């Protein structure tokens, strides 16, 4: 696994996409302390907080469960990360298909895209900001280090190189490293889906943006049914996450 750590970068996602255009070997993880031009859903610019977690990960499709509908990758990975994040933030929940909420406030999100048999996912979390909804009420680098540790442990990557950056006050230089590949086995889509299905009711009162069909625009999630492949059903129309 190739690992890139940056003190500051325009976007972990665009950096990773550029690497894949050069036919880089998978898997690849890119993490940044600061991000100046992050990408949000539907190509919107991500408004970066004073302290946040920014990472992008590229995996080969062959490493994913066979029953995973790739169009629901954001929902799948969003839930996997949510389970780990709840160890520290139990009130977090996943709004369909890819937004992290704390109560009724959005504090982060996850987007996915496919490229050359790779699935690329980008994760952004607001840890602290006095203007934006966030996870913490004060600037705390140890919270960021703790969240990084959760992600690293979750992916089962070799922690030797990662441990060098967790003292975020003193470690300021960029880092490129190679470690052993992950030994993590991803759970089946059905396993993840049934867990999320039990919490889908939390979407009541919220809406989501869809980009196809006669209902193009915002639709109320409480008016929708959740299909087995992660899609929404509204009347006779079906909507996938497309994130």
Predicted regions and their residues:
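N-terminal lobe of the biotin/lipoate ligase/transferase fold
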Residues: 1-87, 149, 206-208
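Long, positively charged amphipathic alpha-helical accessory segments at protein N-termini or as interdomain linkers
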Residues: 21, 62-92, 102-243
